[in-house]
Structures are given as C-alpha cells and as structure tokens.
C-alpha cells in the first residue's frame, strides 16, 4: 500500500474514532458523579452528564471544589461522556 493510501486510512480511522459514541461501559467513572456546585459562591454556568437521562444538563458551579463531572460546554460533556444530543431540563442546585 502506498504512503498516500496509509495516510488516507489513518485519517479515516481517526475520524471514525472521534465520531463513534462512547458506550456506557467505556464512559469515564466521573461521568456518573452527581452535579456538584462546590463550596464557593460564584454563579458559573456549567454542564454535567446525567446518567439517568443520558444527557448533558446545565447546572450552576460555585467556582471551586466540586468534582470532575463539570464541563465548560455541552459539547465537551457530550464528547467526554457520550451523551445523546437531546437537551434536558436545567436542574436547580440549592446554594449553601
């Protein structure tokens, strides 16, 4: 096979890996953690993966603490945790 053919194959496999959804078995464990606003009092919009609905949902992050199930964008959440494209409701997180 020529080097051009190998590069084309490599490009195709890379694209396929990026577009293939993550199965529940391959999902990082932190994707199963609950939304955690943390201990600080800022009001930063973030997203977390909700395994019950298989969706990335919005929550308000306090700015410190919390856990790894915390993403700046819905796309980051979907890419990392393999959520469906449906948009779920924005849950309310009680402030301390």
Curated annotation (Swiss-Prot):
The record marks 41-42 as: Reactive bond for trypsin. It is found in: Secreted. One of its GO terms (cellular component) is extracellular space. Residues 1-24 form the signal peptide. Residues 85-96 form a propeptide. Gene3D superfamilies: Pancreatic trypsin inhibitor Kunitz domain (4.10.410.10). Transmembrane segments: none annotated. It comes from the Eukaryota. GO terms for molecular function: serine-type endopeptidase inhibitor activity. SUPFAM superfamilies: BPTI-like. Its main location: secreted. Pfam families: Kunitz_BPTI. InterPro entries: Kunitz_BPTI, Kunitz_BPTI_sf, Prtase_inh_Kunz-CS, TFPI/VKTCI-like. Disulfide bonds join 31-81, 40-64, 56-77. Keywords: Disulfide bond, Protease inhibitor, Pyrrolidone carboxylic acid, Secreted, Serine protease inhibitor, Signal. The modification Pyrrolidone carboxylic acid is found at residue 25. Expressed by the venom gland. Residues 31-81 form the BPTI/Kunitz inhibitor domain. Serine protease inhibitor. Belongs to the venom Kunitz-type family. This is Kunitz-type serine protease inhibitor C6. It comes from Daboia siamensis (Eastern Russel's viper).
């Amino acid at each position: 096979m020529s080097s051009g053919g190998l590069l084309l194959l490599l490009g195709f496999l890379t694209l396929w890996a990026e577009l293939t959804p993550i199965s529940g078995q391959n999902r990082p464990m932190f994707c199963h953690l609950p939304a955690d606003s943390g201990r600080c009092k800022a009001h930063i919009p973030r997203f977390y993966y909700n395994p019950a609905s298989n969706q990335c949902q919005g929550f308000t992050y306090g700015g410190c603490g919390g856990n790894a199930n915390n993403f700046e964008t819905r796309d980051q959440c979907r890419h990392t945790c393999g959520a469906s494209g449906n948009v779920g409701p924005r849950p309310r997180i009680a402030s301390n």
